[in-house]
Regions:
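Peripheral/terminal regions associated with large enzymatic or DNA-binding modules
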Residues: 1-29, 33-267
Length: 267
C-alpha cells in the first residue's frame, strides 16, 4: 500500500509498475469494476496462451458491444480497449514511458499524429499526453494508450461483456453528473449487462483486428464523429435542464471557456 495519499494519479501508475515488477502477469481491477465469474479464468487462459506473443499487449474485460454480433469465437483482437478490468504482462508494462519521452521524439510524434488522424481517434489524445507530462504526474491511462499505439499493440476482447463499471455518480473521480443526466449512448455503457463465457473457449484461427468493432466503439464515443458529439452535448444539456442540474451546466460552460482560451486542451 502507498504510505502517502497521492491521489488517483500517479497512484495507479506506481501501483501497477510495482505489481508487475513482482509478477510476470497480472489481472487488474479497480474499486468500481464488477467482473463476472468467468472473467478470471478467461484472463488466466489468455495470459498463458499469449504470454510470449509480442503482438498482444493486454486482455480487456469490458466489451462495449455487450455481445459482439460478428464474432463466432470466444474472443477477438482489437486496437481499442477499456481499462475497466484488464490483464497484461510485465513485458508490456516495462515499455511504459512514465516520463512521456515519446513527446520529445519528433519522428515518433509525426507518426503518432498520422496514426491518430488515419484511425479517426480522439483529437485531444496527444494534447492530453502533453498536459499530463507537464503536470509532473504519471497518468497511466494516457501512458498505456500511447504505448499501445507506439508498439502497434492489440488487445484481446471477449465476445461478451464481462465487467460492469459503477463509477458514474455525482461524486465520481473521472465522471461528473448522474445516470439520469447522462446521454443514452453513454448511459448504456454504465448499465450494461455482464455475461459469462462458455468453456472450453473457442480460439480464433488468425490474429487479425476486428475493424468493425473498432468503428462501432469510435461511433459510441463520438471519436471522429463531430455531429454525434454535438448531438450528445445537446442531449446532455437538455437532460441537465430537465432535472435542474444547473451546476453541471455551469461546469461544462467553464470547461468550454477554458478550452477556447487554451487553458484546457481536452475539455
Amino acid at each position: 500500500y502507498q504510505t502517502k495519499n497521492q491521489g488517483c494519479d500517479p497512484s495507479e501508475y506506481l501501483s501497477q509498475k510495482w505489481a508487475f515488477s513482482i509478477v510476470d502477469k497480472c489481472i487488474v481491477l479497480e474499486d468500481d469494476d464488477v467482473p463476472s465469474q468467468s472473467f478470471f479464468p478467461f484472463c488466466k487462459e489468455m495470459l498463458d496462451r499469449y504470454e510470449h506473443d509480442e503482438r498482444i499487449a493486454m486482455i480487456s474485460g469490458f466489451n462495449e458491444d455487450e455481445v459482439t454480433p460478428d464474432c463466432e469465437d470466444s474472443y477477438f483482437f482489437t486496437s481499442t480497449f477499456a481499462i475497466w478490468g484488464w490483464a497484461s504482462w510485465r513485458r508490456v508494462v516495462d515499455k511504459w514511458e512514465g516520463d512521456y519521452a515519446f513527446l520529445r521524439d519528433k519522428q515518433a510524434m509525426k507518426r503518432l499524429q498520422s496514426l491518430v488522424r488515419q484511425r479517426g481517434y480522439r483529437k485531444d489524445f496527444l494534447p492530453m499526453c502533453t498536459e499530463h507530462q507537464q503536470s509532473g504526474k504519471e497518468y497511466y491511462e494516457s501512458i498505456f494508450w500511447a504505448s499501445m499505439l507506439l508498439n502497434s499493440g492489440l488487445a484481446i476482447m471477449p465476445s461478451k461483456n464481462l465487467v460492469n463499471n459503477l463509477g458514474l455518480s455525482d461524486n465520481s473521480t473521472h465522471f461528473c453528473g448522474s445516470i439520469q443526466t447522462t446521454p443514452k449512448a453513454y448511459r448504456r455503457i454504465f448499465t450494461m449487462k455482464r455475461h459469462e463465457l462458455e468453456f472450453p473457449l473457442k480460439h480464433p484461427k488468425y490474429v487479425v483486428e476486428n475493424v468493425d468493432f473498432k468503428e462501432r466503439v469510435y461511433k459510441i464515443n463520438a471519436w471522429g464523429h463531430p455531429f454525434i458529439k454535438m448531438s450528445r452535448s445537446l442531449e446532455e444539456l437538455f437532460l441537465n435542464l430537465r432535472y435542474g442540474n444547473f451546476s453541471s451546466i455551469f461546469k461544462a460552460m467553464a470547461r468550454r471557456c477554458r478550452k477556447m482560451i487554451g487553458r484546457d486542451k481536452h475539455a
